[in-house]
Amino acid sequence: MDVLQKLKNNQRRIGLTGGIASGKSTITNYIRKHKNIPILDADNLSRELIKPNTYGYKKILDYFGNQIIDTKNNSEKAINRKLLRNIIFKHSESKEWIDNLLHPLVKEKMIEECIQYKNNQTIVLVIPLLFEAKFEDICTEIWLVKCPRELQKKRLITRDKISEKEAYETINLQLSFEEKSKFSDIILDNSDDQNKWINTIREIL
């Protein structure tokens, strides 16, 4: 049986997505605090899937070699995620390889988690690259966080301590808001006033 067919048809699976530094974490934290709803995070699952001795870890080590191991900050020989990000940012072929490895693994794991929550009427799936990784088919609806590029840029520079040029390049690696909005059901406006998206969530969740 196709693993997708195991998902309950009457379960509401909300795919929450948006550009980098658009405010997904802020909205996720609000839902976690005010709603008794399970939240699955694709980034967290991705981190779990590249821990030492996992399939993903071994494949990455085979591809990049020992240079990708963080030998200074841990004794477990975990992958240096900052170095990995820098590599795939600069080398498109490495990014494509990582995407082809991790996206299917994360999707499979997320489906398994959804099945575990089969008795929950509603769950939220936080998937930053929902469209890029083609996760649409596991969601029953898609919520997109709206944030102006300038605000994204400022948040990204502050959060990741990178240059303005690097911030723009990182933002441009993802699909634009305009493109994503064509395939989204709900827009959560996180431009300035949080009450905008808070009121929207109160109405529909």
Swiss-Prot record:
Residues 13-205 form the DPCK domain. It catalyses: 3'-dephospho-CoA + ATP = ADP + CoA + H(+). GO terms for cellular component: cytoplasm. Pathway: Cofactor biosynthesis; coenzyme A biosynthesis; CoA from (R)-pantothenate: step 5/5. InterPro entries: Depp_CoAkinase, P-loop_NTPase. PROSITE patterns: DPCK. It is an enzyme of class 2 (transferase). The keyword Disulfide bond does not apply. One of its GO terms (molecular function) is ATP binding. Its EC number is 2.7.1.24. It is found in: Cytoplasm. Pfam families: CoaE. It comes from the Bacteria. The keyword Zinc does not apply. Transmembrane segments: none annotated. One of its GO terms (biological process) is coenzyme A biosynthetic process. ATP binds at residues 21-26. Keywords: ATP-binding, Coenzyme A biosynthesis, Cytoplasm, Kinase, Nucleotide-binding, Transferase. Belongs to the CoaE family. HAMAP family: Dephospho_CoA_kinase. Catalyzes the phosphorylation of the 3'-hydroxyl group of dephosphocoenzyme A to form coenzyme A. This is Dephospho-CoA kinase. The gene is coaE.
